[in-house]
């Protein structure tokens, strides 16, 4: 029976990829046995309740092998993955896109495809489960109690981010993380002996992982036994499973020819004969469906029913926790953060926005027990520390400060995993110039609709002495170009509070907070509520103004000072604070016209960053005071003066407008 089911997985993959004339059959054919063993013997999921909070998670880190996952979901009974959807693999509007997409297809726990990010994201799942278990489980009531399983390939383990995350997972002793390594000695360009020769198991042992080897990737009992041993090891586990890529293909198995191209009609026919598969394309024997129903769907439904009874009993036994747990199960925050939670700030108060951010995040932390995060070894520079808590580790699982180490990319993927798991609000910080290291993870935050908060400090050339390696220039423009990411560069402590409030109440959009090291003064015109519009008027000296200054962050203070100087000379000036171009661009035409009237063409945008994205606001008649070269090393006042960010120079720029 098991051999029939394994071959059903293989041929669903082969046939769908042939029909699409696009895809990666090799991993489907080689990894089918380990995936079958995992789904039918270990994985606890309920296809009728795909979002069950306590389900085991499965991450196909080798996302190019998506037909392996779609075949498993179809056979397991997930309604989203019908046979029609299998036949529509990689087609417009289908539930079976080229790489798995979270939120698009039920049963997909994470978007994967960029190699290395899946296994790294899985680390976040495991850490989320551990925190929620420590927070809410009570004796006899293990409400949060599940494993995170991964299938990865050689390519995943070549990527640096997987090494970052594996080092972190070993340090944290995330013992409910089990990785099956599809070790087939082949990559797209040829054999791994030409590019990847170290002992992966030795490396993972050094990280503090349990490791094992299954020498025959078709030995279902050996795979099952290895997983059982891994679960009892007390460590994260990597099981190397030696497989043959394209298993069963007489002329292509074991070669890179089967990695990323359809088998084609002739080789498919030969493979059918070699594996004894006497069925037509997309024909699956009923006994295969029965096998998956009994060993995946029915087993999972039974586990779900047992768990729902446990939750009901838990609510009676622990009513003080019941409301919070119920909210988490329903996909809500256990406590609502409101604007009233933040203290009212006086005009003239001076503080670096990184410090304002720490004050704001501690307001959130005091209100929301499932709010946690950290920094890539810069907590005392990024100001990301929750003051009431210590560091989280295996013996202090309830603490909410996470020390990610100098692992920016892994930090982003781990945050994504924690957000994907559900039940948590998470954040992570680093210097803004190092946002490039984490950007690929930020992109997957945005693509998956995860409300992760990224805290980026030391936001401009005002860093000064550290020089151009640490002074962001192009970074704001780059992040603003990303779909579904809200970038906030607040002008002062008041706007920083508002940005944090919007970040932790966002449902499907991540947030990047771009913050200063230097002090900024709270302007009289800044407004907590208006930050939600992305831009608003902070200063105006005449109703019939004919000049608009648009500024963000630290340059709002500069723009207001310049406007007052211009006003003293008889000019009629409006200053607009634009903490988020992304949010402002989503406002209706009437609001945009209210803030930036089309009739007023004398406009100057002021920002210590690349100028390119400001021309859509100032037009051909306006000007941009920005930076389109790299920074320099000197005391900050000298650097700012040399780059023209002074009241005198800004006044001159305005006066030079036609």
Language-model features, listed with the residues they occupy:
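A short, small-residue-rich loop immediately preceding and capping a beta-strand
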Residues: 20, 56-57, 108-111, 141-159, ...
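A glycine-rich helix N-cap at a beta->alpha junction
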Residues: 78-89, 170-182, 205-209, 446-461, ...
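Flexible, small-/acidic-enriched active-site or ligand-binding loops
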Residues: 470-473
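Thiamine diphosphate
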Residues: 91-103, 127, 131-134, 140-145, ...
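Conserved acidic/glycine
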Residues: 1-31, 151-152, 156-157, 178, ...
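Short glycine-enriched loops at secondary-structure junctions
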Residues: 89-95, 375-381, 388, 406-409, ...
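Short, surface-exposed connector motifs at secondary-structure boundaries
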Residues: 51, 147-148, 208-211, 421-427, ...
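Cofactor-binding active-site loop characterized by glycine-rich and histidine/acidic residues
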Residues: 30-172, 385-386, 418, 525
């Amino acid at each position: 029976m098991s051999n029939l089911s394994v071959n059903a997985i293989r041929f669903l993959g082969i046939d769908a990829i042939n029909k699409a004339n696009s895809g990666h059959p090799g991993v489907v054919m080689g990894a089918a046995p380990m995936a079958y063993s995992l789904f039918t013997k270990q994985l606890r999921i309920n296809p009728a309740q795909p979002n069950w909070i306590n389900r085991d998670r499965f991450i196909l880190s080798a996302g190019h092998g998506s037909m392996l996952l779609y075949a498993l979901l179809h056979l397991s009974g997930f309604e989203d993955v019908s046979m029609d959807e299998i036949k529509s693999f990689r087609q417009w509007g289908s539930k079976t896109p080229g790489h798995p997409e979270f939120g698009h297809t039920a049963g997909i726990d994470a978007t994967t495809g960029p190699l290395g990010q899946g296994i790294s994201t899985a680390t976040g799942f495991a850490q989320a489960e551990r925190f929620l278990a420590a927070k809410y489980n009570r004796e006899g009531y293990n409400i949060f109690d599940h494993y995170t399983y991964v299938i990865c390939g050689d390519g995943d383990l070549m990527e640096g981010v997987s090494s970052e995350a594996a080092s972190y997972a070993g340090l944290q002793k995330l013992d409910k993380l089990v990785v099956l390594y599809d070790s087939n000695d082949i990559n797209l360009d040829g054999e791994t002996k030409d590019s990847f020769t170290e002992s992966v198991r030795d490396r993972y042992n050094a990280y503090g992982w349990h490791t094992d080897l299954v020498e025959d990737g078709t030995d279902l009992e050996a795979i099952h036994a290895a997983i059982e041993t891994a679960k009892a090891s007390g460590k994260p586990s990597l099981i190397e499973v030696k497989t043959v890529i394209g298993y069963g293909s007489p002329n292509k198995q074991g070669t890179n020819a089967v990695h990323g191209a359809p088998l084609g009609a002739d080789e498919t026919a030969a493979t059918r004969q070699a594996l004894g598969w006497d069925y037509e394309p997309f024909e699956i024997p009923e006994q295969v469906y029965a096998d998956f129903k009994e060993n995946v769907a029915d087993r999972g439904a039974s586990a779900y029913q047992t768990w729902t009874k446990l939750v009901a009993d838990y609510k009676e036994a622990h009513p003080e926790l019941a409301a919070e747990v119920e909210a988490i199960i329903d996909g809500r925050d256990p406590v609502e953060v409101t604007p009233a939670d933040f203290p009212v700030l006086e005009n003239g108060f001076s503080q670096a926005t990184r410090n304002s951010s720490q004050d704001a995040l501690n307001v959130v932390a005091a209100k929301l027990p499932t709010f946690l995060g950290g920094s890539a070894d810069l907590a005392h520079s990024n100001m990301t520390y929750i003051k009431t808590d210590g560091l989280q580790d295996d013996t202090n699982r309830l603490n909410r400060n996470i020390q990610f180490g100098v692992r920016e990319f892994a930090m982003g993927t781990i945050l994504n995993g924690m957000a994907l798991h559900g039940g948590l609000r998470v954040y992570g910080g680093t210097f803004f110039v190092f946002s490039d290291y984490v950007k690929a993870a930020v992109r997957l935050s945005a693509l998956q609709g995860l409300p992760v908060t990224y805290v980026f400090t030391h936001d401009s050339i005002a860093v000064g002495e550290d020089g151009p390696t640490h002074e962001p220039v192009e970074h704001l423009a780059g992040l603003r170009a990303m779909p579904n990411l809200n970038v906030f560069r607040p002008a002062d402590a008041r706007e920083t509070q508002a940005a944090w409030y919007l970040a932790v109440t966002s449902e499907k959009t991540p947030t990047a907070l771009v913050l200063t090291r230097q002090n900024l003064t709270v302007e009289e015109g800044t407004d907590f509520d208006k930050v939600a519009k992305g831009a608003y008027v902070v200063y105006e000296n005449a109703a019939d103004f004919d000049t608009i200054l648009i500024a963000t962050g630290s340059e709002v203070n500069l723009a207001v000072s310049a406007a007052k100087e211009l006003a003293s000379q008889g000019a009629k000036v409006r200053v607009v604070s634009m903490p988020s171009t992304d949010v402002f661009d989503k406002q209706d035409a009437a609001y945009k016209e209210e803030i930036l009237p089309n009739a007023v063409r004398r406009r100057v945008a002021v920002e210590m960053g690349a100028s390119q994205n400001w021309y859509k606001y100032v037009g051909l008649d306006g000007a941009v005071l920005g930076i389109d070269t790299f920074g320099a090393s000197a005391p900050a006042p000298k650097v700012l003066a040399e780059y023209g960010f002074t009241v005198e120079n800004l006044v001159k720029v305005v006066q030079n407008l036609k």
